[in-house]
Regions:
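Bacterial N-terminal signal peptides that target proteins for export
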Residues: 1-9
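N-terminal signal peptide c-region/cleavage motif recognized by signal peptidases
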Residues: 17-18, 22
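N-terminal secretory signal peptides
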Residues: 23-83, 152-155
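C-terminal partner/receptor-binding element of secreted or periplasmic proteins
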Residues: 24-41, 116-155
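A short, structured loop/turn motif at beta-sheet edges
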Residues: 72-75, 99-105
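Short beta-strand segments that buttress and anchor functional surface loops
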Residues: 81-87, 111
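Short, surface-exposed coil-to-beta transition loops
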Residues: 90-97
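Catalytic Cys-His active-site segments of thiol-dependent hydrolases/isopeptidases
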Residues: 108-115
Length: 155
């Protein structure tokens, strides 16, 4: 009886840990992903492998990420989506919107660059260049753009 009690307690603890980990999936920041699971690293490496002239902060997902990633659904598939900036100070001019599938098999991103020093009265939307990574389809491009538009300073 004592052994079965220990087994039950161990099973409950392991199950509880799994639930906490699952609930914590949406609590990540983009700059924490590659160190959190090898699957993220492998998938992201495939995305950036054939891309030319990407900045190191994009290749390594090592920029500033003040916002937590959020869950989003595209075409029935669930993703973690969030922003990453080169630095907190350059976020208005250099940012990356990233989407990883929950199974960590697929990743997409949109690199957004606005000329530095753009006057405040100029719309960043009209002066930005957009570069998609990971060959996102039209629906995924829309999802990445929607995430960018959540920023109140993006107009």
């Amino acid at each position: 009886m004592h052994t079965s009690f220990r087994t039950l307690v161990a099973a409950l603890l392991m199950g509880g840990s799994a639930m906490v980990m699952a609930a914590n999936d949406g609590q990540s920041r983009v700059n924490e992903l590659l160190s959190s699971a090898p699957e993220y690293r492998t998938t992201w490496a495939k995305v950036v492998k054939k891309e030319e002239r990407l900045p190191d902060w994009v290749i390594n997902l090592s920029g500033a990420s003040e916002q937590q990633m959020t869950a989003a659904t595209e075409d029935g598939d669930k993703y973690l989506v969030g922003p990453l900036c080169e630095t907190a100070d350059t976020c208005k001019s250099k940012r990356l919107i990233v989407a990883f599938s929950l199974d960590k098999e697929d990743a997409y991103a949109m690199l957004v660059e606005v000329p530095a020093g753009l006057p405040a009265d100029k719309s960043p939307t009209r002066h930005a260049t957009y570069r998609y990574l990971g060959k996102p389809d039209e629906g995924m491009q829309k999802l990445l753009n929607e995430e960018l538009r959540k920023d109140p300073n993006w107009y």
